[in-house]
Amino acid sequence: MVQRWLYSTNAKDIAVLYFMLAIFSGMAGTAMSLIIRLELAAPGSQYLHGNSQLFNVLVVGHAVLMIFFLVMPALIGGFGNYLLPLMIGATDTAFPRINNIAFWVLPMGLVCLVTSTLVESGAGTGWTVYPPLSSIQAHSGPSVDLAIFALHLTSISSLLGAINFIVTTLNMRTNGMTMHKLPLFVWSIFITAFLLLLSLPVLSAGITMLLLDRNFNTSFFEVSGGGDPILYEHLFWFFGHPEVYILIIPGFGIISHVVSTYSKKPVFGEISMVYAMASIGLLGFLVWSHHMYIVGLDADTRAYFTSATMIIAIPTGIKIFSWLATIHGGSIRLATPMLYAIAFLFLFTMGGLTGVALANASLDVAFHDTYYVVGHFHYVLSMGAIFSLFAGYYYWSPQILGLNYNEKLAQIQFWLIFIGANVIFFPMHFLGINGMPRRIPDYPDAFAGWNYVASIGSFIATLSLFLFIYILYDQLVNGLNNKVNNKSVIYNKAPDFVESNTIFNLNTVKSSSIEFLLTSPPAVHSFNTPAVQS
């Protein structure tokens, strides 16, 4: 048993390990966000006894856990490892042992992150770790160093995984499966892997320079030695902006599959969906300075970054309208994954619209570092990446586990997180427009109302997380008895196999999602005999 999980080279087992780590980290990250919202529920010091450093440590912990230990391990490590080989008809990934080490450096990174919060007074730098706040003068002691090591380890994990996915997709497709026939989820992981490959080395360079500045007396970002902290911001955001697309593009792939299945229609404009994802990925590297309009960039530089940022809205719009066109005229069934997908469309678009306001260099002078920004990126991440994660879970888990979840509870869980997330993040836009700054544990009484509302929302969202854990428990224990469409499931297939994309795709030139044609759960080694793509 120990050997199976510790030394595993099987993509399916490694995917399960990623999911377990993601669930654990997600619960820890949610706990931190709940403490943050409790502290902000009313003006003055509530629970942290005026300890602003601790507040910022919680902000760092929440951000890094949610980004590097929940969304990336679940969407890329979990769904990517499990489904990508199945969808292309491969027996496993190209480098199974690299796959193993890519997972096992993540728990080490988690240990470093947790340790960084427990030594000295923690790393209270924000997840961006900007110098001079993160310099040795402002943060003496090993906290920031440990946080940097945590980022290094997650970077190594993601880089190894990315190399594995790229080689697997290029070299291990089954007979007849050309790149144009790849399912959209495989394309999304493939494009994401390239983004990781190009952006993570830049982050690693930046935080390594910071490590040297802190411990070995270099002056990369030290003004007194001729360095420039703005250089760090450029390096960080050259990674940081592609990173947000790394978080959302696998979600795009999942939503495409879900929308197609529950509308009983092929995705509208499949090839243009691929080109849209690729364009978003490419443009993501050309807009990083929109995060730093207020550091003193030239007017013409600001003009360029404003227009380049707005251009990203075009391929994103193509994707949104293609999904709507897929739904239009379809035979729609509002099962739980479809509810998440439709909510994703509305709320991701909403997050994109607030982003258009932030793209303007002149407007951003007012919005920068206010709760408007927090509201914007949580709409995109909390209701984009997380909703797509839930959609993917409810869509594929019956096929992966061979066990059904309780549909009624799953829909209740959807409505709880839908209401909770909106109640948290919608009021933040009002707070930001009125000038409430981020990362500050106290605020004037004028901001009390909407903060109280947001804190109530965080309780609703946390309740939905507890319900999800129960749904997962119920699925594992009673999965064979749970009914689909009020009928006991007697066939050995996922409940929505009957309306899966395989039906209308098998006889066409488009790729069929072959993961639903396998047994449920799939065998330990699928495709010992290569499948042939028609």
Swiss-Prot record:
Entry binding sites for Cu cation: 241, 290-291
EC number: 7.1.1.9
Record-level GO BP terms: aerobic respiration; cellular respiration; mitochondrial electron transport, cytochrome c to oxygen; respiratory electron transport chain
Residues where Mg(2+) binds: 368-369
Cofactor note: Binds 2 heme A groups non-covalently per subunit.
Residues binding Fe(II)-heme a, per UniProt: 62, 378
Record-listed Ca(2+) binding positions: 39, 42, 44, 441
Family that this chain belongs to: Belongs to the heme-copper respiratory oxidase family.
Full protein name: Cytochrome c oxidase subunit 1
Species whose genome carries this gene: Saccharomyces cerevisiae (strain ATCC 204508 / S288c)
